[in-house]
Every structure is written in C-alpha cells, then in structure tokens.
Amino acid sequence: MAGATDQRRQEVLRAIVADYIASQEPVGSKALLERHNLKVSSATIRNDMAVLESEGYIVQQHASSGRIPTEKAYRTFVDSINDIKPLSVAERRAILGFLERGVDLEDVLKRSVQLLSQLTRQAAVIQLPNLNVSRVKHCEVVLLSPVRLLLVLITDNGRVEQRNVEVDQICEPEHVAKMRDVLNRALDNKTLSDASASLAELAAGEILVDPDIQPMILRCATVLIETLVEQPNDRLILAGASNLTHIAREMPSSLPAMLEALEEQVVVLKLLTNVRDLGHVSVLIGEENEDEQLRGTSVVTTGYGAQGATLGGLGVVGPTFMDYSGTMSKVYAVAHYVSRVLSGG
C-alpha cells in the first residue's frame, strides 16, 4: 500500500486488528471512530473497510455485524511491528529472579515455560538442549555402600544425569578417587559422542587402568554409555495447555487439533528444532504452519542458548487473535534471561 489513502487504510486495519485482539468481537466503523483518532468521517471508514474486505484483510460474518481480521491481516499487523517493546524493569527483575532460583538446567527450563505460559496466557513450550552439542564438564563418583556407587555426569550446559551402579567387589574410598580420575581423563570436555567412544575404549580394556579398579571401571563405563545413548536428542517441556480452553468459543474446530499437537509433541518439536537464531522472534500464523494440526493457531518462537550458541527453541502456541506485540516481547524476554542464567550471568 502506498500514498495517503493506503496509509490511512493501514491505520484502519491496524485498529481493527487491535480491537479484535482485545475483545474477540466484530469491529464496526462507529466503534473505530470512538476508540481511535482516525480524523475521518464514518463514511470514509466504511469505504476503507469495504476496500480492505475486497482485498482479503477482513471479513463480515453476518450482514448486520462488524468485521473480523483474516490471517492476511494478522500477518500485515505482525510485519508492521518494527521493534519488540521491552518489558518494564520490575517485570525483567521478576523473570530473572524466578529463573535464577532453578536448581539445575531442567528446573530452569521448567520454570521458563511456567512463567511464559502465565505471562502470555497461552501454551508455552521449550525444547531441552540437543545433547549432540553438549560437552562433559565433570563426572563425579560417590561411594554409597561398599558395593554401590552413584555416578553423576554434568554437561557444560548444566544437564545433570545420575545413575546408581552395583559392583561385584568391595569398593574402598581410594578406589573411588582412582575411578573418578580415570573417568574424568576419558570424558573431560568431550562432546557426548566422543565421550561415548572413550567410554567404549575403557570398557574394551583399550585404556590401561589399575587392575584393582578395572572391573568397576568396566561396569561404570557400561552404565555411562547406556546413559548417553538412551538420552533422546529432543525433549519438550510444556506448560499452560489449559490456557487454551478459553478459545473454545471462538475456535471450536481448532482446539482439539491444537491440543493433540501439543500432546504428541513431535509437531511442535519439529518447529522448535528449526529455530537457529538467538534474539530473533519468529511468528507463524494459521496456514503458514506446515503441519495441519497447527493451522488454526499462531506460533511465536525464538532460540535460547549459552555463550552465544543456540541450545534449543522456546515459544508459545495460541489462537490467531493473540496479542502479538505483547507475546513477542515476553517470548524474547524469557529467552534472553534463560540464556543469561545458563551462561552464568
């Protein structure tokens, strides 16, 4: 759209979208004049609305009702959002404080989706880090009893895995110290795939170790390999699906498919896996979603990470009439502070 007339129609369209998002009620020309400083006559507004309707931006459900935006209108509205509005200092401080109370990586991520679902009143999702990009930070060996050990594997992005190991000989404290040293020399700062290869060498006896601890090292290496191999590359944490029940009246046909997609996870995981950039918020509206189950929804996503590397995606799934500006701001803010906490800042 170009020129003064087209610019005015853009303003009318933005006003219609904003009013419908706020009320979920059809918008008429009289209401637009009352709520917005459009500085034109009611007849001009009606003419603009007729043009917008002919161009596919708005529709009239009933002859006597106002207009509602189409997905084309929502896309134009989202594309007109030039800057993501920052949250208030109090909101940012509250987000950071809540996330910093997380005891480990998974707790931080659970807190992030709980918070995001509360802030946006939508369903919030986050992808746990792909372990293929993780590195082993430390392996701790704890003596629980003379024949039972606890192995604690810690990755550089804060992931913690714990496994109990039963051994076939009496384990002394000095054995524990030796095993800790052997395992950390084999694992330290290795990617998880390389760590698995090192553990396989230990299990096969290709790396020389003290004969006193070799059987126990074999058992520990086997358990750690199983731990690394069994971890799925992609897992999803979901919160706030119940928030979507409020849209049942406006979108009765979309809600079941939306809830099914969230429950199955595969569809949403595919979306989050494609998130690559930190700091960029992406919005998919209705038919822009490749998967049929999400074509009645809008999905707002971004990446989170540590030390500048993307670890996964997070976002919200909601109705096409969501508050796009507010949702984009909140998704961006939560991702920013998740990244900050994971980076140790």
UniProtKB/Swiss-Prot annotation:
Record's keyword annotation contains RNA-binding: no
Keyword Transcription regulation attributed: yes
Keywords: Repressor, Stress response, Transcription, Transcription regulation
GO molecular function, one term: DNA binding
Gene Ontology biological-process annotations: negative regulation of DNA-templated transcription
SUPFAM superfamilies xrefs: GAF domain-like, Winged helix' DNA-binding domain
Superkingdom of origin: Bacteria
InterPro entries, sorted: GAF-like_dom_sf (IPR029016), HrcA (IPR002571), HrcA_C (IPR021153), WH-like_DNA-bd_sf (IPR036388), WH_DNA-bd_sf (IPR036390), WHTH_transcript_rep_HrcA_IDD (IPR023120)
Functional note: Negative regulator of class I heat shock genes (grpE-dnaK-dnaJ and groELS operons). Prevents heat-shock induction of these operons.
Cited HAMAP family: HrcA (MF_00081)
Similarity-based family: Belongs to the HrcA family.
Record PANTHER family: HEAT-INDUCIBLE TRANSCRIPTION REPRESSOR HRCA
Protein name: Heat-inducible transcription repressor HrcA
